Amino acid sequence: MGEALIDIIVTPDGDIDSVVGGGPVNTARAIARLGTKVSFIGGISHDALGKRIRQLLDADNVMCSIDGDCAAPTTLAIASLDEQGAASYQFLIHGTSSLSVTPEIALSALDANATAVHIGTLAFVFTPLSQATRAVVAALDDDQILMMDPNARPAVMENSSEFWETFNSSLDRADVVKCSGDDLDYMFPDLNNLDAARDIHERSHATVLFTDGSQGVHVFMENDYFQCDVPKINVVDTVGAGDSLSGGFLSFWDRYNLKRSDTRDADKIRAAVEFGIKVAGLTCGRAGAMPPFAHELD
């Protein structure tokens, strides 16, 4: 659940390309390409860029839960890449399709049979989408897994109180929280990243996955901590890498019919994280958020 947008990608040399993006869309596409049934709750415009988004989701077998005819223009993100392929973002969001989702629309689109719900990025920040996110979290059944990824974007977070209200209320229900060093730097500027990730776990008792670039993924669980290594790869860019890890994690969970209670099992968490790392690694090896298909991991 969250935003669907177009990423305008600018290379260090000034070359410009565009791809379908938005953290929640990237996550949904990763899940679908791995063969898991998934639906996307988010506003998609009926303009030319919105049609491009919908066509790509259709091609990847991502179901769109909101069928409404959104007249607002498509949300845009400008992703500027540095020499290492890391992206920094600017957004054009006010008055666009991503903010067309109200709590009523989101609740009507929520599938009661969904085994897991993923939330994050701009859905934590801007009303009414943030309000819709909180409504969906409050409506989850006891057996539904909640995975959240704050994916903080300080450049557009004019209202940090809205972010914190959504984050904290969702954290009370969360089973798995994925966060990056950039997220933790923004959220806990007075703590080092490991202490910040540990703090999130201790506040919520959720399993926390701190993605630490080449240092791997640090996992904080009840009475346990471990680190999953990442292989050395040829990085083209990191756009969608964290989203692909989340998608891989959730697809693994579905593939092996794991339950909400299994999020307390360290062996199962480790296996799901390691699978997510493989998915993210393949995504980093190509330009834009282009997660792999299941056969590429065989």
Model regions: which residues?
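Active-site metal-binding loops of divalent metal-dependent hydrolases
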Residues: 2-4, 23, 122, 150, ...
